[in-house]
Amino acid sequence: IKKSVEKVGYKNIILDSVQSTIFLKLKGMKIGFGALGEGYATDKCRDMMLAKGIKAGIINGSGDMSTWGKQPNGKAWNIGITNPFHPEKLLAVVPLKQDAVTTSGSYEKFVVLDGKRYSHIINPATGYPATGLCSVTVLGPNAETANGLSASLKKKKKTAGLLLLKKYPDYSCIMITD
């Protein structure tokens, strides 16, 4: 695990905007888009629909959602937030009109070893599963940013996560502790 963590982080990535290239300094480094890809794709789909004149809709990209306009009945889109301790139940329902909602959680993808549950979300600083928060839902104007924030906040402790979120005043969150 220690060797894997050595290959994590932006400091070993060289971006060249002139050549439009990315260079990974260390052999074995990889780039994963899991924390941003769904949100980015969701936003792009919404933008394409808006460009085609579609006045209202909801795009669901693997649970990351982007909305615009209103439902045919004139009401906001109602998005259910799953209760991580009872996944068959909703914790809350949030109305969205021109917003996005994303969730990073450990309640759907995990492994149980020796009776202990481990998240699929890894803390890049330690190389071990993230602990402390079992679910983080972020709401805001952009699914890509919300997706990045929910993934980042899930890896932090609650207080540190709330401090980070203060830098993004257009976004709010629902944090559920383990």
Report the location of each language-model feature.
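Mature catalytic core of soluble alpha/beta enzymes
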Residues: 1-178
